[in-house]
């Protein structure tokens, strides 16, 4: 994953660390307007300024961020994904979670986003052992939109629909691990997905990985 790259480590291997900077686009890059400008510890102000000018030229919304795993955007989204993964094992369905977050104002929920990116990002077929739900889905050939099915099933125009097969896979996965499932309402889904994101945002500010709260927003 690009957001796992260490700009400082890359810069340390060069003779001009002050000229090294990261431009992190979000997928799909031709649609998503956000651009993270990743400044290293030794990146010069002039290089940051030039990168901001490039962002403006290509009509992107730029946010200057520091070097940390996930940078800012993916670091915060990882908190949402982690909690969403717990929720589906406790009884919420992927589309219930996605719908709750979409209705709240997100352009896409975590499982629709996973399908768009591809469930096999970072997944290794050779070492997969079925220990995670992602392992089980990938082993079943459910890689996301590109394979026609992931958490959802897709038609030829990539329109998604809830899939009873996924519901059965989740139920079986939970039962095998003796996880007690229950009904989970929309309010709990929102609280559990949003609060960790907010907390992570404050941590990012405290660490100086973002200059201002509006950059995180």
Spans of features found by a protein language model:
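N-terminal glycine-rich phosphate-binding loop for ADP-containing cofactors
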Residues: 1-217
């Amino acid at each position: 994953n690009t957001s796992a790259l260490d700009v400082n480590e890359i810069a340390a291997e060069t003779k001009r660390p002050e000229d090294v900077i990261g431009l992190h686009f979000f997928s799909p890059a031709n649609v998503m307007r956000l651009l993270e400008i990743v400044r290293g510890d030794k990146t010069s102000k002039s290089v940051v300024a030039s990168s901001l000018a490039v962002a403006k030229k290509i009509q992107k919304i730029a946010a200057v961020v520091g070097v940390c795993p996930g940078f800012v955007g993916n670091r915060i989204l990882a908190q949402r994904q982690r909690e969403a993964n717990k929720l589906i094992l406790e009884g919420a369905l992927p589309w219930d979670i996605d719908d709750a977050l979409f209705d709240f104002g997100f352009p896409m929920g975590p499982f629709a986003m996973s399908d768009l990116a591809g469930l096999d990002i970072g997944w290794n077929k050779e070492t997969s052992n079925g220990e995670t739900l992602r392992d089980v889905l990938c082993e079943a050939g459910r890689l996301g939109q590109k394979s026609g099915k992931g958490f959802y099933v897709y038609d030829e125009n990539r329109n998604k629909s809830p899939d009873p097969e996924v519901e059965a896979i989740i139920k079986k996965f939970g039962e095998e691990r003796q996880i007690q499932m229950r009904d989970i309402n929309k309010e709990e889904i929102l609280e559990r997905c949003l609060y960790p994101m907010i907390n992570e945002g404050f941590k990012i500010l405290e660490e100086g990985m973002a200059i201002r709260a509006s950059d995180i927003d």
